[in-house]
Amino acid sequence: MLEMQLFFVSYVLYGLGFVSLIFLPTEHQRLYYLHLVSVIIGLIANYEMKFNILLAMFHSAVHNLWPFLKNTGYDDTEKSVYDVFCHTIMMMLCYHRIYYSQNIVIDSEYLFHVLSVLFILGAMINCLVSHLIIDSHHAQLHSIFEYTTIFQAVSTGYWVATMLWYNNLNHQDFYYHWLLWITLMTTNWFIYKFWPKLVGISMRYKYVEAVFIICTWYSGVLSSQKISC
């Protein structure tokens, strides 16, 4: 029963959150929807989830203040350093939360920690390169930045996996859930790489922001009820 609730309920509700965006006619309405629901859930969530919800909203704000991803695709004239730094911090916070979860059960604990450290180091390299390319026309640097953004795709999967099961990080299947979301978001990175026009469509429907925001809603509601589902 618990497995069905974890895999089915959390995943379906997450997907429905994205479906709602399709029916909203303008970008502003989609943005208001994401933030309004987040504020409402944040009011009833516990302090940990309040912080996570605010962090997801902050990530959205960064995308709007420094829009290096636009409806037209990637814009290398905008600063990306703030976004990738935000991604890296979010992944580090997730790793810290999982690492210190009480009675955490991970079948491949050593591999989990090794991969997590490698992912964080890769994301930090991407942060450094994103700073170096500011006002730089060095083609090789821009190429390195582009390919190291795969670690930010990993950080997205890391965040989604942690937020969806935030109240059940000690579940025996968490490791597979974690791997699934990292794989999905990494696949998404490759899709963007080969079909760059999808970046513009994603930005138009606020997908890039919604990925981080919607996954906090389910755990936010549960945290207010102190229920482990």
UniProtKB/Swiss-Prot annotation:
Transmembrane spans: 6-26, 36-56, 80-99, 114-134, 144-164, 174-194, 207-224
Main location: membrane
Mode of membrane association: Multi-pass membrane protein
A GO CC term assigned to this protein in UniProt: membrane
Record localization: Membrane
Keywords recorded for this protein, A-Z: Membrane, Transmembrane, Transmembrane helix
Family: Belongs to the mimivirus L68/R809 family.
Protein name as annotated: Uncharacterized protein R809
Record organism: Acanthamoeba polyphaga mimivirus
